[in-house]
């Protein structure tokens, strides 16, 4: 079982989701199954089948989270001295040299990556292009949308 890097925040989020799924959602689903079962014939009971499917998804996610937590290698960058180098868990302020757009990404593990929240998987094209670079470096990153040029404006360990 290979260890997977995860930030302290990412691990905490997974633990919170696990508690929610076990203590809140699981009892709600059991109640929905019980309610649907009381309606009679289970073969043509859409409510029952929908609740059972939701139960399957919920239990699958619980298993998945337990596996992620078991494999977690927590990296807490707040306990490291910041030398301006982009590392796993660091927050990076960038300027797109082609458009002038400023953007901030946090470099994270695969199980916590979320582009909408600007959480970038360290093995993604952008993550690989930034890891090991330093504040004020100019970087050229090959993305699916083409080559992008950035300047690293700041690197924070938060």
From Swiss-Prot:
Keywords: DNA-binding, Transcription, Transcription regulation. It comes from the Bacteria. One of its GO terms (biological process) is DNA-templated transcription elongation. GO terms for molecular function: DNA binding; RNA polymerase binding. Pfam families: GreA_GreB, GreA_GreB_N. Necessary for efficient RNA polymerase transcription elongation past template-encoded arresting sites. The arresting sites in DNA have the property of trapping a certain fraction of elongating RNA polymerases that pass through, resulting in locked ternary complexes. Cleavage of the nascent transcript by cleavage factors such as GreA or GreB allows the resumption of elongation from the new 3'terminus. GreA releases sequences of 2 to 3 nucleotides. PANTHER family: TRANSCRIPTION ELONGATION FACTOR GREA (PTHR30437:SF4). NCBIfam families: greA (TIGR01462), PRK00226.1-2 (NF001261), PRK00226.1-4 (NF001263), PRK00226.1-5 (NF001264). Belongs to the GreA/GreB family. HAMAP family: GreA_GreB (MF_00105). This is Transcription elongation factor GreA. The lineage of its organism: Bacteria, Pseudomonadati, Pseudomonadota, Alphaproteobacteria, Candidatus Pelagibacterales.
């Amino acid at each position: 079982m290979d260890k997977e890097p995860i930030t302290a925040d990412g691990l905490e989020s997974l633990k919170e989701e696990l508690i929610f799924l076990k203590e809140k959602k699981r009892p709600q689903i059991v109640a929905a199954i019980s309610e649907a079962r009381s309606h009679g014939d289970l073969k043509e009971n859409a409510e029952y089948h929908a609740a059972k499917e939701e139960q399957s998804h919920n239990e699958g996610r619980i298993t998945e989270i337990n596996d992620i937590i078991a494999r977690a290698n927590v990296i807490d960058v707040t306990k490291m001295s910041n030398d301006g180098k982009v590392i796993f868990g660091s927050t990076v302020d960038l300027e797109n040299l082609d458009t002038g757009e400023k953007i901030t990404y946090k470099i994270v593990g695969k199980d916590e990556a979320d582009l909408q929240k600007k959480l970038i998987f360290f093995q993604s094209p952008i993550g690989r292009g930034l890891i090991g670079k330093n504040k004020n470096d100019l970087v050229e990153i090959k993305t699916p949308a083409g080559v992008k040029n950035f300047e690293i404006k700041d690197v924070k360990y938060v």
